Design a protein with these regions (language model features):
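Short clusters of hydrophobic/aromatic residues that line enzyme substrate/ligand-binding pockets
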Residues: 18, 28, 75, 98-101, ...
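Short, acidic (Asp/Glu-rich) active-site segment that either coordinates a divalent metal cofactor
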Residues: 76, 88-91
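Short, ordered loop/turn segments at secondary-structure junctions
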Residues: 23, 70-72
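Flexible loop/turn segments at secondary-structure boundaries
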Residues: 27, 74-77, 116-118
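N-terminal accessory segments
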Residues: 1-32, 39, 61-64
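N-terminal glycine-rich flavin-associated loop
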Residues: 9, 34-66, 70, 84, ...
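Extracellular beta-strand-rich solenoid/capping regions of secreted or surface-exposed proteins
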Residues: 80-82
Length: 130
């Protein structure tokens, strides 16, 4: 089943959005402090919400656990999969755009993988603070 799942994931996110080898996935499978380490069937890096939806539908259809991961900078290891190796790690790093900053309403719309430092730097250039 693993080969079928990998092929289906590849069809959704393409070469740039799929990592399966140990060397390619290592940085995703260890937390920021190096305290927690896990394994996964694949690291999937969608670029759109449509791709996220397709990955989630595939995982649901095959009863596969999905571990979401933003920047992997958390302190608790919650974005690190367990050691079973049968989950999909859903990295949102490629969904890193700032869609809108509305200075009047003091709000912004950003994608899930947008790094906090980027938000801070971008708003600071506009005389705002995040």
């Amino acid at each position: 089943m693993s080969a079928e799942i990998i092929a289906a994931l590849h069809a959704i996110v393409g070469d740039a959005g799929l990592k399966t080898g140990d060397t390619d996935t290592e940085s995703f499978l260890t937390d920021w402090h190096g305290q927690y380490r896990g394994r996964s069937l694949a690291v999937v890096m969608p670029e759109t919400t449509e791709q996220v939806s397709q990955v989630m539908a595939l995982a649901d259809a095959h009863n596969i656990v999905v571990v979401p991961q933003g920047g992997n900078t958390g302190f608790m290891g919650g974005a690190t999969p367990d050691d079973a190796g049968n989950s999909i790690l859903l990295s949102l790093r490629r969904m890193n755009r700032i869609r809108e900053i509305d200075a009047t309403n003091m709000s912004m719309t950003v994608e899930a993988g947008c790094v906090l430092q980027t938000l801070h730097d971008t708003t600071e250039k506009q005389g705002l603070y995040f």
